UniProtKB/Swiss-Prot annotation:
Family (UniProt): Belongs to the glyceraldehyde-3-phosphate dehydrogenase family.
Pathway: Carbohydrate degradation; glycolysis; pyruvate from D-glyceraldehyde 3-phosphate: step 1/5
Primary localization: cytoplasm
Protein name in UniProt: Glyceraldehyde-3-phosphate dehydrogenase
Binding site for D-glyceraldehyde 3-phosphate: S150, C151, T152, T181, T210, G211, R233
EC class: oxidoreductase
Annotated GO biological process: glucose metabolic process; glycolytic process
MF GO annotations: glyceraldehyde-3-phosphate dehydrogenase (NAD+) (phosphorylating) activity; NAD binding; NADP binding
PROSITE patterns assigned to the protein according to its UniProt record, in alphabetical order: GAPDH (PS00071)
Active site: C151 (nucleophile)
Annotated site residue numbers, Activates thiol group during catalysis: H178
GO cellular component: cytosol
Length: 337
Protein backbone atom coordinates (compact mmCIF):
# COMPACT_ATOMS: atom_id res chain seq x y z
CA UNK A 1 0.00 0.00 0.00
CA UNK A 2 1.35 3.42 -0.99
CA UNK A 3 1.68 5.97 1.81
CA UNK A 4 -0.06 9.27 1.00
CA UNK A 5 1.92 12.26 2.22
CA UNK A 6 1.54 16.03 2.37
CA UNK A 7 4.43 18.47 2.63
CA UNK A 8 4.22 21.73 4.58
CA UNK A 9 6.99 24.10 3.52
CA UNK A 10 8.39 23.89 0.00
CA UNK A 11 11.85 25.18 0.86
CA UNK A 12 15.14 23.35 0.55
CA UNK A 13 14.21 20.16 2.40
CA UNK A 14 10.58 20.19 1.29
CA UNK A 15 11.57 20.16 -2.37
CA UNK A 16 14.32 17.57 -1.90
CA UNK A 17 11.88 15.33 -0.02
CA UNK A 18 9.50 15.74 -2.97
CA UNK A 19 12.22 14.80 -5.48
CA UNK A 20 13.16 11.77 -3.42
CA UNK A 21 9.52 10.71 -3.24
CA UNK A 22 9.42 10.42 -7.02
CA UNK A 23 12.09 7.70 -6.69
CA UNK A 24 10.39 6.06 -3.69
CA UNK A 25 7.79 3.50 -4.79
CA UNK A 26 6.13 3.36 -1.37
CA UNK A 27 5.37 7.09 -1.08
CA UNK A 28 2.97 9.34 -2.98
CA UNK A 29 3.03 13.10 -2.39
CA UNK A 30 -0.58 14.24 -2.75
CA UNK A 31 -0.41 17.84 -1.49
CA UNK A 32 1.99 20.68 -0.77
CA UNK A 33 1.41 23.79 1.33
CA UNK A 34 3.50 26.95 1.27
CA UNK A 35 2.03 30.41 1.92
CA UNK A 36 4.99 32.25 0.43
CA UNK A 37 5.16 30.59 -2.99
CA UNK A 38 2.59 30.60 -5.78
CA UNK A 39 2.22 27.42 -7.90
CA UNK A 40 4.16 28.59 -10.98
CA UNK A 41 7.12 29.58 -8.83
CA UNK A 42 6.90 26.30 -6.92
CA UNK A 43 7.02 24.43 -10.24
CA UNK A 44 10.05 26.46 -11.32
CA UNK A 45 11.95 25.79 -8.10
CA UNK A 46 11.12 22.10 -8.26
CA UNK A 47 12.23 21.85 -11.89
CA UNK A 48 15.55 23.69 -11.57
CA UNK A 49 18.01 23.06 -8.77
CA UNK A 50 21.55 24.45 -8.69
CA UNK A 51 22.82 21.57 -6.58
CA UNK A 52 20.98 18.51 -7.83
CA UNK A 53 20.24 19.48 -11.41
CA UNK A 54 17.06 19.61 -13.44
CA UNK A 55 14.06 17.55 -12.36
CA UNK A 56 13.82 14.40 -14.44
CA UNK A 57 10.11 14.40 -15.14
CA UNK A 58 7.18 16.41 -16.39
CA UNK A 59 5.99 19.41 -14.36
CA UNK A 60 2.90 21.47 -15.18
CA UNK A 61 0.65 23.92 -13.40
CA UNK A 62 -3.08 23.41 -13.82
CA UNK A 63 -5.19 26.01 -12.06
CA UNK A 64 -3.74 26.30 -8.56
CA UNK A 65 -2.32 22.79 -8.52
CA UNK A 66 0.82 21.05 -9.76
CA UNK A 67 0.77 18.13 -12.16
CA UNK A 68 3.85 15.94 -11.84
CA UNK A 69 4.27 13.11 -14.34
CA UNK A 70 0.53 13.20 -14.96
CA UNK A 71 -0.50 13.15 -11.29
CA UNK A 72 -2.24 16.09 -9.65
CA UNK A 73 -0.63 17.52 -6.51
CA UNK A 74 -2.91 19.89 -4.61
CA UNK A 75 -1.13 23.15 -3.79
CA UNK A 76 -2.28 25.17 -0.78
CA UNK A 77 -1.09 28.54 0.53
CA UNK A 78 -2.28 28.51 4.14
CA UNK A 79 -0.20 30.26 6.82
CA UNK A 80 -1.88 28.42 9.69
CA UNK A 81 -1.28 24.63 9.60
CA UNK A 82 -4.69 24.11 11.20
CA UNK A 83 -6.35 25.47 8.04
CA UNK A 84 -4.67 23.12 5.56
CA UNK A 85 -7.35 20.67 4.33
CA UNK A 86 -5.14 17.57 4.22
CA UNK A 87 -8.19 15.31 4.38
CA UNK A 88 -9.24 16.49 0.89
CA UNK A 89 -6.31 14.59 -0.59
CA UNK A 90 -6.15 11.67 1.82
CA UNK A 91 -2.80 12.83 3.18
CA UNK A 92 -2.57 10.65 6.28
CA UNK A 93 1.00 11.76 7.03
CA UNK A 94 2.52 15.25 6.84
CA UNK A 95 6.16 16.24 6.51
CA UNK A 96 6.57 19.46 8.47
CA UNK A 97 9.52 21.15 6.74
CA UNK A 98 9.00 24.86 7.36
CA UNK A 99 11.47 24.92 10.23
CA UNK A 100 8.85 26.90 12.16
CA UNK A 101 6.43 24.36 13.64
CA UNK A 102 9.01 22.15 15.33
CA UNK A 103 7.37 21.54 18.70
CA UNK A 104 4.68 18.98 19.39
CA UNK A 105 1.96 21.55 20.06
CA UNK A 106 2.71 23.58 16.94
CA UNK A 107 3.00 20.54 14.68
CA UNK A 108 -0.22 19.06 16.06
CA UNK A 109 -2.13 21.83 14.28
CA UNK A 110 -1.90 19.68 11.13
CA UNK A 111 -4.19 17.13 12.76
CA UNK A 112 -7.06 19.64 12.67
CA UNK A 113 -6.98 19.50 8.86
CA UNK A 114 -7.28 15.74 8.77
CA UNK A 115 -3.69 14.52 8.96
CA UNK A 116 -3.08 11.74 11.46
CA UNK A 117 0.69 11.89 11.97
CA UNK A 118 3.36 14.58 11.52
CA UNK A 119 7.06 14.01 10.87
CA UNK A 120 9.17 17.09 11.59
CA UNK A 121 12.19 17.33 9.27
CA UNK A 122 14.31 19.00 11.94
CA UNK A 123 15.30 18.45 15.56
CA UNK A 124 12.51 19.10 18.04
CA UNK A 125 12.63 20.38 21.58
CA UNK A 126 9.97 17.97 22.79
CA UNK A 127 8.83 15.56 20.06
CA UNK A 128 10.41 12.09 20.15
CA UNK A 129 13.30 11.77 17.70
CA UNK A 130 13.87 8.74 15.51
CA UNK A 131 16.89 7.82 13.41
CA UNK A 132 16.40 5.01 10.92
CA UNK A 133 18.61 2.04 11.71
CA UNK A 134 19.19 3.25 15.25
CA UNK A 135 16.00 3.60 17.30
CA UNK A 136 13.12 3.50 14.81
CA UNK A 137 11.94 0.22 16.34
CA UNK A 138 10.97 2.10 19.51
CA UNK A 139 8.19 3.93 17.62
CA UNK A 140 4.67 3.11 18.81
CA UNK A 141 1.28 3.77 17.20
CA UNK A 142 0.19 6.29 19.82
CA UNK A 143 2.85 8.83 18.77
CA UNK A 144 1.25 11.57 16.66
CA UNK A 145 4.20 13.94 16.20
CA UNK A 146 7.78 12.81 15.76
CA UNK A 147 11.09 14.20 14.55
CA UNK A 148 13.54 12.78 12.03
CA UNK A 149 16.31 14.54 14.02
CA UNK A 150 18.95 16.45 12.03
CA UNK A 151 21.04 15.47 9.03
CA UNK A 152 24.15 15.41 11.23
CA UNK A 153 22.52 13.22 13.88
CA UNK A 154 21.45 10.86 11.08
CA UNK A 155 25.09 10.61 10.00
CA UNK A 156 26.58 10.31 13.47
CA UNK A 157 24.10 8.00 15.21
CA UNK A 158 24.45 4.89 12.98
CA UNK A 159 28.24 5.06 13.22
CA UNK A 160 28.15 5.66 16.97
CA UNK A 161 25.75 2.73 17.40
CA UNK A 162 28.07 0.32 15.58
CA UNK A 163 31.12 1.45 17.53
CA UNK A 164 29.32 1.48 20.88
CA UNK A 165 27.69 -1.93 20.38
CA UNK A 166 31.03 -3.51 19.49
CA UNK A 167 33.62 -1.60 21.53
CA UNK A 168 31.68 0.58 24.05
CA UNK A 169 32.19 4.34 23.80
CA UNK A 170 33.34 5.90 27.06
CA UNK A 171 33.15 9.47 25.75
CA UNK A 172 33.60 11.36 22.52
CA UNK A 173 33.75 14.66 20.68
CA UNK A 174 32.35 15.35 17.23
CA UNK A 175 33.03 18.05 14.68
CA UNK A 176 30.89 18.30 11.59
CA UNK A 177 32.54 20.07 8.68
CA UNK A 178 29.28 21.32 7.24
CA UNK A 179 28.37 22.94 3.93
CA UNK A 180 26.70 26.33 4.19
CA UNK A 181 22.91 26.44 4.36
CA UNK A 182 20.10 28.91 3.63
CA UNK A 183 20.32 30.52 7.07
CA UNK A 184 23.78 31.90 6.30
CA UNK A 185 24.70 35.13 4.51
CA UNK A 186 25.81 35.75 0.92
CA UNK A 187 27.63 38.89 2.15
CA UNK A 188 28.37 40.06 5.69
CA UNK A 189 25.13 40.99 7.42
CA UNK A 190 23.50 41.38 10.82
CA UNK A 191 23.17 38.27 12.96
CA UNK A 192 22.62 39.42 16.51
CA UNK A 193 22.42 35.96 18.10
CA UNK A 194 25.42 34.55 16.22
CA UNK A 195 27.94 37.19 15.18
CA UNK A 196 30.15 34.76 13.29
CA UNK A 197 27.11 33.34 11.53
CA UNK A 198 26.52 36.73 9.93
CA UNK A 199 29.75 36.58 7.95
CA UNK A 200 29.95 35.69 4.26
CA UNK A 201 29.33 31.95 3.84
CA UNK A 202 31.33 31.53 0.62
CA UNK A 203 34.51 33.15 1.97
CA UNK A 204 34.84 31.85 5.49
CA UNK A 205 35.23 28.80 7.70
CA UNK A 206 32.75 29.63 10.45
CA UNK A 207 32.75 27.90 13.85
CA UNK A 208 29.19 27.21 14.96
CA UNK A 209 27.21 25.26 17.51
CA UNK A 210 25.28 22.05 16.88
CA UNK A 211 23.14 19.87 19.07
CA UNK A 212 23.64 16.85 16.83
CA UNK A 213 26.07 14.99 19.07
CA UNK A 214 24.04 15.54 22.23
CA UNK A 215 20.94 14.42 20.32
CA UNK A 216 22.56 11.02 19.81
CA UNK A 217 21.99 10.52 23.53
CA UNK A 218 18.26 10.78 22.88
CA UNK A 219 18.23 8.05 20.24
CA UNK A 220 20.91 5.92 21.95
CA UNK A 221 20.16 6.44 25.66
CA UNK A 222 23.32 4.60 26.70
CA UNK A 223 25.35 7.45 25.15
CA UNK A 224 23.44 10.22 26.90
CA UNK A 225 25.95 12.71 28.32
CA UNK A 226 28.89 10.97 26.65
CA UNK A 227 29.00 12.90 23.37
CA UNK A 228 29.05 16.56 22.44
CA UNK A 229 30.23 18.47 19.42
CA UNK A 230 30.53 21.56 17.28
CA UNK A 231 30.25 22.57 13.64
CA UNK A 232 32.55 24.25 11.16
CA UNK A 233 30.53 25.83 8.35
CA UNK A 234 32.67 25.77 5.21
CA UNK A 235 32.38 27.30 1.70
CA UNK A 236 30.85 24.29 -0.06
CA UNK A 237 27.24 24.13 -1.23
CA UNK A 238 26.40 20.55 -0.22
CA UNK A 239 27.77 17.36 1.37
CA UNK A 240 29.25 17.44 4.86
CA UNK A 241 31.49 15.20 6.93
CA UNK A 242 31.52 14.09 10.56
CA UNK A 243 34.78 13.77 12.47
CA UNK A 244 34.13 11.61 15.54
CA UNK A 245 36.87 11.17 18.13
CA UNK A 246 36.08 8.58 20.80
CA UNK A 247 37.64 6.81 23.73
CA UNK A 248 36.82 3.10 23.76
CA UNK A 249 36.41 0.76 26.71
CA UNK A 250 37.28 -2.32 24.68
CA UNK A 251 40.54 -1.82 22.84
CA UNK A 252 40.54 -2.39 19.09
CA UNK A 253 42.91 -1.91 16.20
CA UNK A 254 41.79 0.43 13.44
CA UNK A 255 41.44 -2.59 11.15
CA UNK A 256 39.06 -4.21 13.64
CA UNK A 257 36.99 -1.03 13.72
CA UNK A 258 36.86 -0.96 9.92
CA UNK A 259 35.72 -4.58 9.86
CA UNK A 260 32.90 -3.83 12.31
CA UNK A 261 31.66 -0.86 10.29
CA UNK A 262 31.88 -2.77 7.00
CA UNK A 263 29.93 -5.69 8.45
CA UNK A 264 27.15 -3.33 9.57
CA UNK A 265 27.15 -1.48 6.24
CA UNK A 266 26.86 -4.76 4.33
CA UNK A 267 24.35 -6.18 6.79
CA UNK A 268 21.73 -4.67 9.12
CA UNK A 269 22.48 -1.04 8.24
CA UNK A 270 22.73 -1.53 4.49
CA UNK A 271 21.35 1.52 2.71
CA UNK A 272 21.78 3.67 5.81
CA UNK A 273 25.46 3.25 6.66
CA UNK A 274 27.99 3.03 3.85
CA UNK A 275 31.64 2.00 3.75
CA UNK A 276 34.31 3.07 1.29
CA UNK A 277 38.04 2.71 0.86
CA UNK A 278 38.06 4.92 -2.23
CA UNK A 279 39.94 8.23 -2.21
CA UNK A 280 36.74 10.28 -2.28
CA UNK A 281 36.09 14.00 -1.81
CA UNK A 282 32.84 15.74 -0.93
CA UNK A 283 31.38 16.22 -4.42
CA UNK A 284 31.65 12.48 -5.06
CA UNK A 285 28.76 11.99 -2.64
CA UNK A 286 26.36 14.60 -3.99
CA UNK A 287 23.02 12.82 -4.34
CA UNK A 288 23.99 9.85 -2.16
CA UNK A 289 20.92 8.40 -0.45
CA UNK A 290 22.73 6.92 2.56
CA UNK A 291 22.78 8.64 5.96
CA UNK A 292 26.45 8.06 6.66
CA UNK A 293 29.34 6.90 4.48
CA UNK A 294 32.33 5.75 6.53
CA UNK A 295 35.66 6.79 5.01
CA UNK A 296 37.98 3.95 5.97
CA UNK A 297 41.13 5.70 4.73
CA UNK A 298 40.46 9.03 6.44
CA UNK A 299 40.35 7.84 10.06
CA UNK A 300 43.30 7.40 12.41
CA UNK A 301 43.97 5.83 15.79
CA UNK A 302 46.40 6.94 18.48
CA UNK A 303 46.14 3.62 20.27
CA UNK A 304 43.60 0.82 20.69
CA UNK A 305 41.40 2.94 22.93
CA UNK A 306 41.52 6.34 21.24
CA UNK A 307 40.41 6.77 17.65
CA UNK A 308 39.23 9.37 15.14
CA UNK A 309 36.56 8.24 12.65
CA UNK A 310 35.36 10.06 9.54
CA UNK A 311 31.98 9.67 7.85
CA UNK A 312 30.40 11.65 4.99
CA UNK A 313 26.78 12.59 4.30
CA UNK A 314 24.77 14.45 1.71
CA UNK A 315 23.06 16.73 4.19
CA UNK A 316 20.20 17.38 1.76
CA UNK A 317 19.57 14.24 -0.28
CA UNK A 318 20.46 11.52 2.22
CA UNK A 319 18.52 13.19 5.01
CA UNK A 320 15.44 13.69 2.84
CA UNK A 321 15.48 10.02 1.85
CA UNK A 322 15.45 9.06 5.54
CA UNK A 323 12.40 11.26 6.12
CA UNK A 324 10.55 9.12 3.58
CA UNK A 325 11.95 5.86 4.95
CA UNK A 326 10.76 6.86 8.41
CA UNK A 327 7.30 7.65 7.03
CA UNK A 328 7.07 4.25 5.37
CA UNK A 329 8.30 2.53 8.53
CA UNK A 330 5.76 4.19 10.84
CA UNK A 331 3.00 3.57 8.29
CA UNK A 332 3.76 -0.15 8.48
CA UNK A 333 3.65 -0.06 12.26
CA UNK A 334 0.40 1.90 12.08
CA UNK A 335 -1.03 -0.70 9.70
CA UNK A 336 -1.30 1.77 6.82
CA UNK A 337 1.31 0.31 4.46
Amino acid sequence: MVVKVGINGFGRIGRIVFRNAIEHNDVEIVAVNDPFIEPHYAAYMLKYDSQHGQFKGDIKVEGNDLTINGKTIRFYTEKDPANIPWSETGAYYVVESTGVFTTTDKAKAHLKGGAKKVVISAPSADAPMFVMGVNNETYTKDIEVLSNASCTTNCLAPLAKVIHDKFTIIEGLMTTVHSYTATQKVVDGPSAKDWRGGRTAAQNIIPSSTGAAKAVGKVIPDLNGKLTGMSMRVPTSNVSVVDLTVRLEKGATYDEIKEAVKAAADGPLNGILGYTEDEIVSTDLNGDTRSSIFDAKAGISLNKNFVKLVSWYDNEWGYSRRVLDLLVYIAKVDGNA
